[in-house]
Amino acid sequence: MSRSQEELEATLQIAKVNPEDLRSTVHCLSFSSEFTSGDYSLMELDDTLCKQIEAGDSLVIRGDKSDHAVLCSQDKTYDLKIADTSNLLLFIPGCKLPDQLPADQQPLSVIHCEIAGFSNHYWELRRCRPKLKKLKKLLMENTYNGPENESESSQETSLYTTEDLLSVIQSSTEELMDHLKAIHACNIKGIWRLLDFDYEMKLLNHITQLIDSESWSFSKVPLQVCLQELRSLEPEEMIEHCLTCYGKRLMEEGGDCFALDEDKICRATALMLLQNAVKFNLAEFQEVWQQSVPDGMNTRLDQLKGLALVDRTSRPETIFLLQTEDLPEDTQERFNTLFGMREKWTEADIAPYIQDLCGEKQTIGALLTKYARSSMQNGIKLFNSRRPLS
C-alpha cells in the first residue's frame, strides 16, 4: 500500500522523530503481487569473486548427489555452507543505499519499492582443496599403452574430455589442469589419458639411452634431434610428452631443448622398483636403485618424500611404497590411516603425507597441533593420535 508524504510526516510526528535527523528520502515497502518465499537464495562473495562476476565470469556448483556441493571459479574451489541470520533479509530491487542518496537535506521524497523475496539464511563460501582423488581412478580405467595396443573397445569406453572430467570432478578448471599435469596425463586427440606406467618408463628409457649414446648433457637435450632419432620407435607426441613430464623446456636459438629433472627420474625409477615389493631391505634397495638410474645421476632418500617410507625400527632397516595419493582426502581420515599404520611419527616422516592438507594460511605445525599430540623420546619429538583409534 502506498503512503503519501502527509502520512509519512504524521507517522514521524507520532514516533517523535525529527525529520531533520533523517535522510530526506523514504522507502515505502510493500510485497509484490507475485511474491513467493523460496524463490531466491543469497550467497556471500568476497571482493575477488564479485569482480569476476561483474566481469562476466561464471561460478559453477559441482558435485554428484552423494557429494557435498562445492562452488568453483576459474581457479579456486569453495565449500558451500548454509549460515543462518537472526534477522530476516529482504530482497528489494530498486532500493537505494545511503551512498546513492543526496547528502544535502532535500524536501521529503518517497520511493515505493516492492519486496521480491526474503530469506533467513545465506550460502557462505570457504576456500577448500579440490576433490581430485577420483580423477586418477577414472583415468586408470583406460590407460594408454602405445598406438599398437589401442583397440576399438578402448576407444569406446571410459574416455574423458576436459568437459567430461569437470562434470564429475569437484574442482576448478585451473586446479584440474594443474593436477592432470602433475599425474602426467596426456591429451590425445582431445581425450585425457594416463600412460601405462611400464609404457611411460619405456619412453623414458629410450630417451636416456639416446642421451647416453650421443653423450648429451642431461641439462640440454635437443628436442628435434631426439624426435628424429626416436620416431621409428614411438610416436613423436609421446616422446615430447615424456620429456615434458621429466624435464623443463628451454627456448634456445638453435631450437627447443629440455633440461631433465634428476629428482623426477630417480623418483620414477624408485617407484618402478618398489611397486611390486611389500618391503625392501633398505641397504639393498639403495644399491639397486643407484644402479638402475642413468649414469651421472645420484639417488637420495629425500627424493622419495610422499612416495616411500623408511622403517628404521626394523632390523635390517626396510623401505616400502606409501604414496600420498593413495591416502584418504579427508583430514581426520588421513591422520587415522597414518596413525593406524604407525603409532608414532617424527615430523620429518609425516610431513610429506599431510602437506597437501594445509589450507592457504595453514602450516604443518598447526595441523599436527590439532590432530596429534607430541611427546619426547630420546630427545626426538614424536607425534601420535590425539583421539583413540577404533
UniProtKB/Swiss-Prot annotation:
InterPro entries: Dcc1. It is found in: Nucleus. GO terms for molecular function: DNA binding. The keyword Membrane does not apply. GO terms for biological process: DNA replication; maintenance of mitotic sister chromatid cohesion; regulation of DNA replication. Pfam families: Dcc1. The keyword Cell cycle applies. Keywords: Cell cycle, DNA replication, DNA-binding, Nucleus. GO terms for cellular component: chromatin; chromosome, centromeric region; Ctf18 RFC-like complex. Belongs to the DCC1 family. Component of the ctf18-RFC complex which consists of ctf18, ctf8, dscc1 and the RFC complex. Loads pcna onto primed templates regulating velocity, spacing and restart activity of replication forks. May couple DNA replication to sister chromatid cohesion. This is Sister chromatid cohesion protein DCC1. It comes from Xenopus laevis.
